[in-house]
Amino acid sequence: MEPQFKVKIDNDSARILKELAEKKRDEGLRVVFIGPPGSGKGTQAPLVKEDYCLCHLSTGDMLRAAIEQGTETGKQAKTIMDQGGLVPDEVMVNMIKENIQTPECKKGFILDGFPRTVPQAEKLDKMLAEDNKKIDHVLDFAIDDSLLVKRITGRLVHPSSGRSYHREFFPPKVDMIDDITGEPLIQRSDDNEEVLKKRLESFHKNTTPVLGYYQNKGILSTIDASKSAPFVSHTIKSIFLSTLHFPHNASIFKTFHQKMKMQVHSTETPLAAEIL
């Protein structure tokens, strides 16, 4: 669908806008992805990671890596998991802290799978504040549960990177082969309707308070995750651009900024698709 409004930007203004966007990339971003299984987080994370030179931190991947590498946090987690227990919040936060201090996370990070509860969100904020940092954006990948069944049952995953594809909506260039590495894709054994319903019930119960926590902080943006992958990608760019500090004496940027903020919650083609 064509956007109902457009902003004409001259060459100088367009140049300034691109420079501001680059500044945003240089400053770094700390982003939390929240969404149910099948909402498209796994598709969008590599795109945002590449565009903004961020690291993608998935709690499951971090746990496995820490255990395999034998880090102190990994040893603690393994001992607890071997006894059938849940990894405490403090251990998870320490593991995240270890990861964000690596060179790969210098420009910021995408955190996927954490926090799942308000106490976890509070502990994460406290840990970041100790280093004078904070979460910049929380993206809520909102989608109706009924649409997730079709997505989940057709989902394909590249095990080592976590890249996600879909047989119908986002197929790989070659069937069952990862576009980047040429390695085989898999379909997870728990990607079925029965397991999905249980996961969704747990997700909604735990996540609703977390969304409220970030809403109160003014950093929550809700995305219509039922849209196509390119549309969602451009929406994410629009959200990031909407927080740029435009020159106060440039009326064209004030207009653009207002339109961009309006469009974050719109169903129209994001302006970021036309400009960047």
Curated annotation (Swiss-Prot):
Residues 154-191 are annotated as: LID. Its EC number is 2.7.4.3. Its main location: cytoplasm. ATP binds at G38, S39, G40, K41, G42, T43, R155, S164, Y165, K227. It is found in: Cytoplasm, Cytosol; Mitochondrion intermembrane space. SUPFAM superfamilies: P-loop containing nucleoside triphosphate hydrolases. Keywords: ATP-binding, Cytoplasm, Kinase, Mitochondrion, Nucleotide-binding, Transferase. It holds the Pfam family ADK_lid. It is an enzyme of class 2 (transferase). One of its GO terms (biological process) is ATP metabolic process. It catalyses: AMP + ATP = 2 ADP. One of its GO terms (molecular function) is ATP binding. AMP binds at T59, R64, G85, L86, V87, G113, F114, P115, R116, Q120, R188, R199. Residues 58-87 are annotated as: NMP. GO terms for cellular component: cytoplasm; cytosol; mitochondrial intermembrane space; mitochondrion. InterPro entries: Adenyl_kin_sub, Adenylat/UMP-CMP_kin, Adenylat_kinase_CS, Adenylate_kinase_lid-dom, AK2, P-loop_NTPase. Catalyzes the reversible transfer of the terminal phosphate group between ATP and AMP. Plays an important role in cellular energy homeostasis and in adenine nucleotide metabolism. Adenylate kinase activity is critical for regulation of the phosphate utilization and the AMP de novo biosynthesis pathways. Consists of three domains, a large central CORE domain and two small peripheral domains, NMPbind and LID, which undergo movements during catalysis. The LID domain closes over the site of phosphoryl transfer upon ATP binding. Assembling and dissambling the active center during each catalytic cycle provides an effective means to prevent ATP hydrolysis. Monomer. NCBIfam families: adk, PRK00279.1-2, PRK00279.1-3, PRK14527.1. This is Adenylate kinase. It comes from Dictyostelium discoideum.
